[in-house]
């Protein structure tokens, strides 16, 4: 949607919107989530580019129909030289492999490119616009992930409340114990903080994507996305971890669901950057070191 390539958007977006194909983003080749993680090379030749390298942590990368990929021209560093491409996942030279992860509910893959040749028409970004465009996409993705994490945190809290209400000890429900109430109150606060941050960030993203929206939304997007990802990541993990504890001895067993939420919370905390990473990004924005 952010690309200036109208032909590519007309071709792919209609199919995505109709549910005919699925698409995913591949850009990082390491455990980092900034521009330094882009190491796949895009060597230009007459009429196109030749790509070589490997992507890691590609969500649904083994099953998707369309890949949106980021690569950099040889010798470029930092934000310079980054290009974005759209290509069918079955393009010759692409190999995909699903990788085992902590979270069985989200499929990740590695995608390897070997002498993959793309035409100039498959380029999504103009020279110099690759990273700014990708950076905004990642911020919007963080907001979407934060909303998912908030829902996971709420569900973790709900299933915990249902369990402790029915669990009796010393002739009474353990939900009536003051210490348990305090812990549940802390979890509710974590969920509400994540929810508020996610709602606000979603409003900012809506303004940014609206052609008639507030022009200042782009400047607010970076701060809102980082704040939402921080609160949602920490809130979800806190709720999932406490859910295991408050379920007692059955909390870590496969017969109960808390372990699924715990794994999802930990994996989602790492995806698109940890809270520590986003705090660093937030500090850079506040001090004017990063747009």
Segments (PLM) and residue ranges:
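Active-site-adjacent elements of ketosynthase-type condensing enzymes
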Residues: 31-41
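A short core secondary-structure module
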Residues: 52-97
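Residue-level signal for inorganic ion chemistry
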Residues: 5, 25, 53, 85, ...
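Flexible, small-/acidic-enriched active-site or ligand-binding loops
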Residues: 37-39, 57, 88-126
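Short beta-strand-to-turn element immediately C-terminal to the catalytic PLP-Schiff-base lysine
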Residues: 1-4, 43, 69-72, 86-89, ...
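Alpha-helical interface subdomain recognition
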Residues: 3-8, 15, 19, 45-49, ...
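A generic structural signal for beta-strand entry/edge sites
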Residues: 46-50, 66, 108
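A short, Trp-centered hydrophobic/proline-enriched beta-strand micro-motif
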Residues: 19-30
């Amino acid at each position: 949607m952010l690309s200036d390539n109208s032909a590519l958007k007309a071709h792919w977006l209609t199919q995505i919107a109709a549910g005919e194909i699925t698409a995913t983003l591949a850009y990082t080749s390491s455990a980092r989530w900034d521009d330094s993680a882009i190491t796949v090379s895009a060597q230009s030749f007459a009429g196109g580019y030749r790509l070589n390298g490997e992507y890691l942590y590609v969500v649904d990368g083994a099953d998707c129909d369309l890949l949106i990929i980021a690569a950099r021209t040889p010798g470029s560093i930092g934000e310079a030289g980054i290009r974005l491409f759209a290509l069918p996942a079955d393009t010759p030279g692409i190999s995909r492999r699903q990788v085992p992860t902590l979270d069985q509910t989200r499929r990740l893959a590695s995608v390897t490119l070997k002498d993959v040749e793309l035409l100039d028409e498959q380029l999504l970004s103009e020279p110099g616009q690759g990273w700014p465009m990708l950076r905004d996409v990642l911020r919007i993705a963080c907001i979407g992930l934060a909303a998912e994490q908030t829902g996971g945190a709420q569900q973790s809290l709900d299933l915990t409340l249902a369990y402790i209400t029915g669990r009796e000890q010393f002739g009474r429900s353990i939900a009536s114990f003051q210490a348990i109430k305090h812990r549940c109150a802390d979890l509710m606060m974590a969920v509400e903080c994540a929810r508020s941050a996610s709602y606000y960030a979603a409003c900012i993203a809506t303004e940014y994507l609206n052609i008639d929206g507030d022009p200042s939304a782009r400047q607010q997007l970076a701060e809102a996305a980082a704040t939402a990802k921080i609160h949602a990541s920490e809130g979800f993990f806190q709720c999932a971890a406490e859910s295991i504890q408050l379920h007692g001895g059955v909390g870590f067993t496969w017969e109960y669901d808390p372990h699924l939420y715990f794994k999802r919370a930990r994996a989602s905390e790492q995806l698109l950057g940890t809270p520590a990473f986003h705090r660093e990004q937030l500090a850079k924005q506040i001090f004017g070191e990063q747009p």
